[in-house]
Structures are given as structure tokens and as C-alpha cells.
């Protein structure tokens, strides 16, 4: 792990979108707001994303692609980039984690880790 690997901090807030979910059809929509904070000394560009999404039944799906929400943002030192996206699960509980493929101002490629976070309907967990 290089110093660049730890220069990016990822914070996550999740929300269950009840009005667009259909529990009777086993469809649970969640939004997640991601804040990517550049704690390093160089600007860093987010080029790719890789998500691993697991529902309560153990079913796993992967999402890979360029950028996030149609953007490949460059995050200057000591600033943050925030976006909101969503995912649909077949269960009221799930977990997501993954990585962002980043490139530093000097051209060094590295991965920013997105630690596992929970998606859960209100009242499901205490």
C-alpha cells in the first residue's frame, strides 16, 4: 500500500427510499451519498468504480465502469467530491463495498478503498 492509497477517505450515508420500493415484490431501493475526501498533497482523478453488492440471501452482483454518475472528477488536495446514486435489492438488508480507480496528478495509479457499508430498511436492525 502506497501513501496514495491512504490519501483518499470515502464516507457513506445511506437512505431507504420507501416510496419507490415494493416489499411485496421483494424490491427495496436504497440511495447512498458518497463523499470522497482528498487528504493528499496532489490532485487525484477518479477514473473507475468497482462495487460488490450482496443482499441478505448472499446473492452478489458486481458493478464496474468509468467514473461515477457520468463524471470522472478531479479532486484537488484538501477538498471533497460528493455524489448520490442508488441500488435496488431483493431483500431489506444488504452490504456494499468496493474501490475507486484513481490516478494522481503525477500519473501514479492507485485504488481508493470503499469499506463495507450496510443498506437496511428502518427498524430492521437495532
Curated annotation (Swiss-Prot):
GO biological process: error-free translesion synthesis
Superkingdom of the organism of origin: Bacteria
SUPFAM superfamilies linked: ApaG-like
Pfam families (alphabetical): DUF525
Annotated ApaG domain residues: 2-126
Family annotation (InterPro entries): ApaG_domain, ApaG_sf, Uncharacterised_ApaG
UniProt cross-references to NCBIfam families, sorted A to Z: PRK05461.1 (NF003967)
PANTHER family: F-BOX ONLY PROTEIN 3, POLYMERASE DELTA-INTERACTING PROTEIN 2
Protein name as it appears in the record: Protein ApaG
Organism the protein comes from: Shewanella sp. (strain W3-18-1)
